[in-house]
């Protein structure tokens, strides 16, 4: 057992892209009835149990997400948990920012719905190959699985 990891608090930045602030309102059959605020509470509760420090960021604006990631590039031993939403399929800018971040840090991609079982255009994923792990189609539980994965590293 690695005793050192029990004393080290990990810093995780949870980034959510467009329309995720509408969880519990939009497309409940795809995304479930959990609201965005409930998701934040759920993740914070699990993080507290695991002694993980969490910072949340959500934006519907691509450039704001890029700026947020760029501001994290020089932070060492941090993780990003990202659900880029629709930007998964379209944003080279977010991919480039994540790729720079990944040179010194780790990334877990989360998608609430199974993007591989949806419309053809959603099967394009511009970020999965630069992420350490992808958790897809597990509902909001995917965020908890991301924390558990990070905690095991």
Pin down the residues of each PLM region.
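Extreme N-terminal starter segment of soluble prokaryotic enzymes
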Residues: 8-13
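Short, glycine-/small-residue-rich phosphate/pyrophosphate-handling segment
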Residues: 103, 116-153
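Short glycine-rich anion-binding loops that position phosphate/pyrophosphate groups of nucleotides
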Residues: 18-20, 85-88, 113-115
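Glycine- and acidic-residue-enriched helix-capping/strand-helix junction motifs
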Residues: 23-38
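Short beta->alpha junction loops
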Residues: 55-63
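Short Gly/Thr/Asp-enriched flexible loops that form oxyanion-binding sites at enzyme active sites
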Residues: 90-102
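Short, acidic/small-residue loops that bind anionic groups at enzyme active sites
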Residues: 100-116
